[in-house]
Each structure stands twice: as C-alpha cells, then as structure tokens.
Amino acid sequence: MTLTIITINYNNAEGLRKTLASVASQTYADIEHVIVDGGSTDESVEIIREYARANGAHAGSLTNNCHQIHWLSEPDNGIYHAMNKGIRMATGEYCQFLNSGDLLLNPNVTQQMIEHMDQINAQREEPIGVMYGNMKKVMPDGKILHDACNGGHDVTLEMFYRGCLNHSPAYIARALFQKYGMYDESLRICSDWKFYMQSLVLGDESVEYVNVDVTLFDMTGISETNKNLLNKERNQLLEELIPQGILKDYHAYHFPMDQYRRLKRFHLWGLVHFIERVLFKLEKWHILR
C-alpha cells in the first residue's frame, strides 16, 4: 500500500530540512512524498534541489531511501489551496499531512501504522476511511505535551463541537476527497474540521484509533488570533452544516455536558452524584407529603 505524505512549506527552510529528513529515515519503503512550496524566498527550494542532486534525480522528482518525492514551488492562495494541490498530485491510497517543521517520531512509525492499517482492513469489506494515532505537541514555551486527541472514543457531533481529530497523525483515504471534495479554500483555519465533520459525522465514514505516537507537531505558530478565528469559523460551519432544530438543542445541552466532563476530570463526580441523590429524595418526600 502506498502512503502519500504531503508537506506544505513557505519560507521555513530549517523546518523543511528536518521534515524531509524524518520522512527519508522511514523504514517503510512504499512512501510517496509530495512537497508543495508556496514560492519561498529563503533556502527552501535549494534544500529540495540538494536532495534531488544527492540522489541523481531530475528537478521535480527524487528518490530517497526507496521513497518517491515529487515537488513544486509556486505561489498559492493559502494553506488549504496548497494542500489541495498536494492531494491532486497524490497517487497513494492514503494521505498524511506533515507540514514543514513537523516530524515523524521515529524511523519505524510509518511501518507500525501501515501494519495496523493492514490488520484493520483485513477484517473489513471496505478499507477504513480514516485511521489516526497520537501526536506530541511542542508548545511555545518549549514544553512537550502528549495528545491522544479523541483516544478511541466515538467520533460524534459532540466531539467536533469542542474539538477536532488531529491532522498530522491521521491517514486519510484519498477516496474520501474524491467523494466529499477537497478542502474548502474560502476558510483560513477550519477547513480540515469541516472535511472531517462532513465525512466522519454527517457521512458516517469509518474511523479507527491506533495507540501509537506518530508525529511531533510544532505549536509555536498557534496564536490567540488563530484560536479566535478557529472558533468563529467553527461556529459559522455549525450553522451551515447542522439543521437549526438539532443545533438549538445541541447548544442547550452542550454546557451541562461540558460541566460534567470537567467534574469527572477533577474526580468530583461522586460528590455531585451524592448531592443529586439527596435532592431527588427530598423532592420525592415533598411530593409524597
């Protein structure tokens, strides 16, 4: 099975160098690496060409450790425009997005994930739609946090109301882009959320979690402005995708569900349950009087 790893880059030469090296180190041979550069003015293009020259390949395509790498460098209209270019160039059955600065955590991780994929698909009539693992996040203060995302729980509307599946450790069937369309280029930050919502929640496509640490994701570029824009776009998309009758009920029930999760996280649910039972008995006693 061919996995297409798509890397988006713009003026991040050092990050690109590290990303290329992490992909080149993979022991799994059947990797197609598509690099979409947005017309960088730093050393990015020269770094790609160095790899090409080192492997005796012509510009635009190179072979590294049995991996096919195809690339282009031209201006784009934003990250989702660039990602869609990468999807159009892809020929693998599954796509993984690993942007410049992001790393695969060890040389065997792709092999591990493909083995899990083969085991899952061997038990199914149709190939899995999305398979995802864990990622580690490098925070702006240098701390590294472990993120299992949904951690194997059901992928539901409620989950997408408060978050999204992580992108870099996900293997997405290329057939889903053919079925649901590619990323919405009118959005600046939330198009992957929209695609997941349409395919996994509304389209009920299959999804599987594998407890493997797959990628190291650089969070240093995530600003408060980006977070605010994400919330704005997400709310707009909820209005666009979810019928109003369902959405109104969901808004009404989301707050108590969120509070319930917080209480469980801090091990206070037992106390709340005790108080609830006391109030129930008092209410029952009052009715019987």
What are the language-model segments listed below?
Residues T110, L200-D204, I222-S223, L238-L241, ...:
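Short amphipathic alpha-helical patches
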Residues P243-Q244, D249-R289:
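Membrane-proximal basic amphipathic "stem/tether" segments
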Residues A21, R88, N235, E239, ...:
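A short, amphipathic alpha-helical segment
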Residues M1-K227:
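Nucleotide-sugar donor-binding/catalytic module of glycosyltransferases
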Residues V212-D213, F217-T220, E224-Y250:
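Catalytic core of nucleotide-sugar-dependent glycosyltransferases
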